[in-house]
Structures are given as structure tokens and as C-alpha cells.
A protein has these predicted regions:
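Soluble, non-membrane globular domain cores that form compact, hydrophobic packing
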Residues: 2-91, 97-163
Length: 163
């Protein structure tokens, strides 16, 4: 009789753990799609204040199309800082989406750019390759960020705080 009660207790514990995990997943999913009302310029300025801007230049809409295959007209706002030289790997792309349905399209474009850059530096640009390995793509609701920098983690933290 005691074994049955102990078995029920373990089963109940497992059940509650599963319920807690499901709730945590749901909350995390909802928070990830939270639309931010943060001003784009404020977020951009916060992010770029943490980056080494001496190694980057501002990208035009044409450059965004060329490097990412994205049409800037599809988004509320989009801005790119990319390497000044072919040997640079520092890069920041910030996008404010018109609709969160575009998250996967933007993520795919960012992943493609990262892969292209890693292929470019594979075998000879070890410093740049390592930087790209640490680069991050972060999507939070209506904002998307791609960052490749020496201090990527710090820039991402600043981005998330600015939202």
C-alpha cells in the first residue's frame, strides 16, 4: 500500500514539474513576441554607443538589399553599420518590423549574412571568424538585431534593456 502512495506522489511531482515547464515555455513565447514601443533612434543609439564605430560605416538601403536581401520598404525602420574594409567583421543590423510575422524572414536573412561572412573568413581570417562565431541574432517582438563585434554580449544586453 505504501508503494502505491509513493508512486502516486512521484507521479504527481512529475505532473507538476511538467505543468511548470509548459507554463514557463508559454510565458517565454509570449514575451518573445511582445511588441516594443521603444523609439528606434533611442535603441539604435544605445546599441551603437557600445560598439566600436571606428571600424564600421553606415549602410545605405542599397547595401542592405545587397548584403541581406531585405527590402527596407518592408519595415518600419532598418539601419545597418557594416565593416569599412573587406577584412572587417564588425557589423550591426537593427530592424523594427511592421509585423511580427516577418521575424523568420529577417532571421533567415541575418543567418545567411552570418554564414556568408564566416565562409569569407574561413581558413585565413581567424580573428574575424572567431568574432563571427560569437555574433548573435536576437529577435524580440517587433525588433531584430544582428551584431558581430568584440563585445557582442554587452551590445545584446544593451539592446534588450533599451526595449
Amino acid at each position: 500500500m505504501k508503494n502505491k502512495k509513493a508512486g502516486m506522489t512521484i507521479l504527481e511531482i512529475v505532473k507538476w514539474i511538467l505543468v511548470a515547464l509548459i507554463m514557463a515555455f508559454i510565458i517565454h513565447s509570449l514575451m518573445g513576441n511582445r511588441v516594443s514601443k521603444a523609439d528606434f533612434s533611442t535603441v539604435w543609439n544605445a546599441v551603437t554607443a557600445k560598439a566600436d564605430s571606428s571600424k564600421m560605416q553606415e549602410g545605405s538601403n542599397q547595401m542592405i538589399r545587397r548584403l541581406y536581401g531585405l527590402d527596407p520598404a518592408q519595415f518600419d525602420e532598418i539601419r545597418l553599420d557594416y565593416p569599412k574594409t573587406n577584412m572587417g567583421a564588425e557589423e550591426i543590423l537593427l530592424v523594427r518590423l511592421k509585423k511580427t510575422d516577418d521575424q523568420e524572414m529577417v532571421r533567415t536573412a541575418m543567418e545567411s549574412r552570418k554564414k556568408t561572412q564566416m565562409n569569407n573568413f574561413n581558413g585565413y581570417g581567424t580573428y574575424q571568424y572567431a568574432m563571427l562565431e560569437k555574433s548573435q541574432i536576437v529577435i524580440r517582438g517587433n525588433y531584430a538585431l544582428f551584431v558581430s563585434a568584440e563585445n557582442t554580449a554587452e551590445i545584446v544586453q544593451t539592446f534588450e534593456s533599451a526595449l
